Amino acid sequence: RRPIGLKGENVHYIHKPEQIPALLTEIGLPLPRKLAIEWDASHGDFTRLSAVFPDAEITNGSAVMRKVRSVKTDYELGLLHESAVKHAEVYHRIESVYHNGMTDIELQIEIERLLRLHGNLGLFRINGQSMEIFMGNVICGDNADTPTPYDFAMGGAGLSCSIPVGCNGSLIRPGMTVMIDMCGNFTGYMTDMTRVYSV
């Protein structure tokens, strides 16, 4: 998302937005008359950018940014493919870390360990206010019916009411189905894979 070491005519590095006006002046560009900001940006970011460009008209740039992000370069597609291949390799090993008597959290920890050992970066970004999850979600039994207040396809009560999603310490019993929805981030581009296993 923020690569370093890029070179090119229009590549300039800054440490904070307040440096942008001086940079634009230095390279001979005018300050913007209109500034598009994503509407789900924090109030602090909105206020800060507005102060950097006090004469600019602020407009909603959410739709434009979503459209820009939806189109991937060949380089980005390559990174997504690389991440997906590694993600799939880990999923082929999930059965090897399961043993009788495990809880959902114990299985999730083993899957997280596999992911990290295979190069998963361990950091995931979720779009949306106050939505958090660690590396994914493993749910089984009655917990699979528990709704979450988050805008996720899967629910689960979670281990704490402060993060109400995911595994809750349920014992995985014979005859149960286990839904595994773990994130892959091996290249800076996220993949998501969901599988259902029968015990």
State each model region's role.
Residues 2, 59-62, 69, 73, ...:
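Short, acidic (Asp/Glu-rich) active-site segment that either coordinates a divalent metal cofactor
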Residues 44, 133, 186-188:
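Flexible loop/turn segments at secondary-structure boundaries
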Residues 1-90:
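A composition/biophysics-driven feature that prefers long, compositionally simple stretches
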Residues 87-176:
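Active-site cores enriched in adjacent His and Asp/Glu residues with nearby glycine-rich loops
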Residues 36, 112, 198:
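Residues in well-ordered beta-strands of folded domains
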Residues 67, 93-97, 199:
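General structural signal for alpha-helix termini and helix-helix connectors
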